[in-house]
Amino acid sequence: AIHRQTLQALQQAQPTGHWVLKSPNHLWCLPALLEAYPDARIIWTHRDPAKVLPSLASLNCAMQMQFTRQLEPERVGNYWADKIERAITRAALFDSERQPGWCYHLQYKEFIADPASALATIYANFDVPMTELHAQRISAWLSQRPQHADGVHAYDPADFGWSNGSLQQRFSQYQQRYAVPIEG
């Protein structure tokens, strides 16, 4: 209840017909999320953990540097690798216990390759009509915000004591189960 009330308070100035919650943090609590929002439409985006984890660890290190001079990147990285591994394991178990179609599994690579088409597929999957106006707005938004227009987030897995191979080995079951391609 408090989650819903918080969202309602946040949107008070601009009411909307639905919310879009974008966070891997929801992987830890899918049962509670669906209990609170039984009509939720879940999109689980799958991406190579060897790309996700160094980025996540780098962002968390940048935030922590604001508060400490004793930053330990390997410790931060291992914390997040453990946390994401538990989240994926928990979410995959939940996924295996649900009926097919309870969520839409989206490959990040497919989304990046053609975002408008991926969104149209998602809408169709959930039987939500996409109006021509909506499609035009999506197209306009995408053309005004090309990927990497504001720069590229640079990071190196080695900064956190990893190699791409070590992360791919650690998350191989996830990548096999959901056909998550290894990114170059």
Q: Predicted regions: what is each one?
A:
Residues K22, L33-S58:
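Conserved phosphate-donor/acceptor-positioning beta-strand/loop module used by diverse small-molecule
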Residues T6, Q11-D39:
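Flexible, glycine/threonine-enriched loop-and-boundary segments that flank and lead into catalytic domains
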Residues A1-Q14, H18-W19, L53-H105, K109-G184:
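PAPS-dependent sulfotransferases, especially Golgi type II membrane carbohydrate sulfotransferases
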Residues S23-H26, E35-P38, T45, I84-A87, ...:
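Active-site-proximal structural scaffolding
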Residues S23-L27, P49, E110:
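Short, flexible loop/turn elements at secondary-structure junctions
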